[in-house]
Swiss-Prot record:
Family membership: Belongs to the pseudouridine synthase RsuA family.
Record's keyword annotation contains Mitochondrion: no
Domain of life: Bacteria
Name of encoding gene: rluB
Domain S4 RNA-binding: 64-136
Compositionally biased spans, kind Polar residues: 1-10
The name this protein goes by in its record: Ribosomal large subunit pseudouridine synthase B
EC number of this enzyme: 5.4.99.22
Signal peptide: none
Amino acid sequence: MKFTKPNSRQNKPHVEQKTSRRSTNANAVASKNVKKVTEAQPKSVKASTHSVKPTVKNPLVEGEKLQKVLARAGQGSRREIEAMIAENRVSVDGKIATLGDRIDVHAGVKIRIDGHLINLLHAQKEVCRVLMYYKPEGELCTRHDPEGRPTVFDRLPRLTGSRWIAVGRLDINTSGLLLFTTDGELANRLMHPSREVEREYSVRVFGQVDEAMLHRLKKGVQLEDGPANFKEIKFAGGVGMNQWFDVTLMEGRNREVRRLWESQGVQVSRLIRTRYGNISLMKSLPRGGWEEMDLTNVNYLRELVGLPAEVETKLDVTKPRRRAKTGQIRKAVKRYAELNKRYKK
């Protein structure tokens, strides 16, 4: 009789092989899953580490446009500053600026125009100033004339740290109301056609004018730079071939009033701007004279173009100083009068 051992290979050899194969397959699948997890994990960790990496701010990419900041600081209108940038006259932190550059005013950037450092923080504290000027005929709306002819800037009060910016232009043969401001953004918005700020002119024309012509001028005519028209035309007097009209426009293109009349075969012999928005030319203002606007008128212009109102103007800031100076002058005059009386006795 033969006996077999209970733990010998002859007992359940097939079952043992199946078990080992199943365990091997399970281990292989588990190792594959672990491998997939371990392979996917570093990628997510890497991505998260990359996302929390601190970004370095570039003052030339973030912030406001350079020309807008300089315009608000009273260095000129946006158009003037864009011309300066194009001429390589503006630098930011020692590098020549280009159109499209943006800056963060509070980042401590150093901006220079023609080598002169611009104090932006000081300019932000300055209040907005607006002048009404009665431009006479014969003056140019430019800062410098190579021929030495008089300009509208010659008679204006001197400024330190900023400059007067003309709100639009009047040609050499046109007189009347011209606004100046120290806020380039205000000037830019007032001049922009999208704001549709009314300009009123008193115009004397030479030629035959009839109702059909006035109707065409109000409906619109085609000029070389596009269609144009008067919003309003009112007869203001005159006889024969010389007649006066009050006309209103919603934009200020170059010589637009003259060109509109000339398109109908009529010549303009006199042109005076009398109103800009609701600001009318003061009758008491002499030709070549200027008057600084009060807070009410300054804020009217700012709100007209969507800018925040000012709390005070230069007139309010300097009022105590001017009052003290006036008092000193009065005392000096009184003292002088008393000395004269004593001397005569």
